[in-house]
């Protein structure tokens, strides 16, 4: 008679903590689906409401004229760049592209003597030729010309740079090709050369990535504050921590593109927000400053305005 061994077999069940996680995940998924359905219904209601909204004839005319001017500006730039590629630049005073650096004039330098017309508004302007070397630029998306719809070509460039939303920003590597793209989207962005301090501040405070954890079904946006995630995603490139990402971006290293697209576009604050009397006054002052620093030209050879981006980052970061 063979010996019968009564071995204790483990129950075919999952631990309580795993069941709780699954239950929470199911509840979260259902809540997200319900929110998505509500947003879709709200969007449909707004579309129906906008269709019935009365629009004045003056608004239609203003929108049409502003959009036509913007399309004509882009057409001129595209035509000029095409001629440059063909070498037909005999009609141009210079083949180079230019920056117009606009900086606030230090108060200590203000005197009662006669000053140039460019400096009467408190800003110094310097036109600098672009030498074709690779440079790091910080590009911030802002509102474009009043009443103008964004032309398709400009919107495609903004989408490629991941700048569909206002007050989002990215780092880009400036080359001859990207300079031409910046000329097309110039009215919709603010451009500047960031310092290492600003780069470090942005990445440490505002950096987010899309990451999928083991216990999650879908990838979601999280704050980047774990070097283990950096090593997991970028370790093959020799980038193992956040400081390595800062170094690659600041020095335009060989892994600049991978590190840059690993980060989501930076979502920054508004320079002035709120509806109090003081904030309304600040908004008026901000508009006056923008009129002086962001003068948009419809000329195809207009330089790209470059501002003191470090001062702006300190305000909105």
From Swiss-Prot:
It is found in: Nucleus, Nucleolus. Gene3D superfamilies: Ribosomal protein L30, ferredoxin-like fold domain (3.30.1390.20). Pfam families: Ribosomal_L30 (PF00327). It comes from the Eukaryota. Residues 1-11, 25-49 have a biased composition (Basic and acidic residues). Belongs to the universal ribosomal protein uL30 family. This is Ribosome biogenesis protein RLP7. It comes from Candida glabrata (strain ATCC 2001 / BCRC 20586 / JCM 3761 / NBRC 0622 / NRRL Y-65 / CBS 138) (Yeast).
């Amino acid at each position: 008679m063979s010996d019968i061994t009564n071995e204790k077999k483990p129950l075919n069940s999952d631990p309580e903590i795993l069941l709780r996680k699954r239950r929470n995940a199911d509840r979260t998924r259902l809540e997200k689906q319900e929110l998505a359905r509500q947003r879709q219904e709200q969007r449909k209601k707004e579309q129906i409401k906008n269709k019935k909204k009365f629009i004045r004839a003056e608004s239609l005319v203003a929108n049409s004229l502003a959009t036509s001017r913007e399309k004509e500006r882009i057409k001129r730039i595209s035509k000029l760049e095409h001629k440059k590629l063909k070498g037909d630049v005999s009609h141009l005073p210079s083949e180079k592209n230019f920056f117009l650096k606009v900086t606030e004039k230090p108060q200590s330098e203000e005197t009662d003597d006669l000053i140039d017309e460019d400096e009467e508004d408190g800003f110094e302007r310097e036109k600098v030729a672009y030498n074709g070397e690779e440079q790091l630029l910080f590009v911030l998306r802002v509102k474009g010309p009043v009443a103008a719809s964004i032309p398709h070509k400009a919107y495609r460039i903004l989408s490629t740079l991941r700048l569909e939303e206002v007050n989002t920003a990215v780092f880009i590597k400036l080359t001859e090709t990207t300079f031409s793209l910046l000329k097309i989207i110039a009215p919709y962005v603010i451009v500047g050369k960031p310092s290492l301090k600003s780069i470090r501040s942005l990445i440490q405070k505002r950096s987010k990535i899309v990451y999928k954890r083991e216990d999650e079904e879908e990838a979601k946006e999280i704050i980047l504050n774990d070097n283990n995630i950096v090593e997991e995603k970028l370790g093959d490139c020799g980038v193992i921590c956040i400081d390595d990402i800062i170094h690659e971006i600041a020095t335009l290293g060989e892994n600049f593109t991978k590190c840059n697209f690993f980060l989501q576009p930076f979502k920054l604050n508004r320079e002035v927000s709120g509806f109090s009397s003081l904030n309304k006054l600040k908004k008026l002052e901000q508009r006056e400053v923008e009129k002086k620093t962001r003068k948009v030209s419809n000329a195809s050879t207009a330089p790209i305005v470059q501002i003191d981006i470090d001062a702006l980052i300190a305000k909105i970061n």
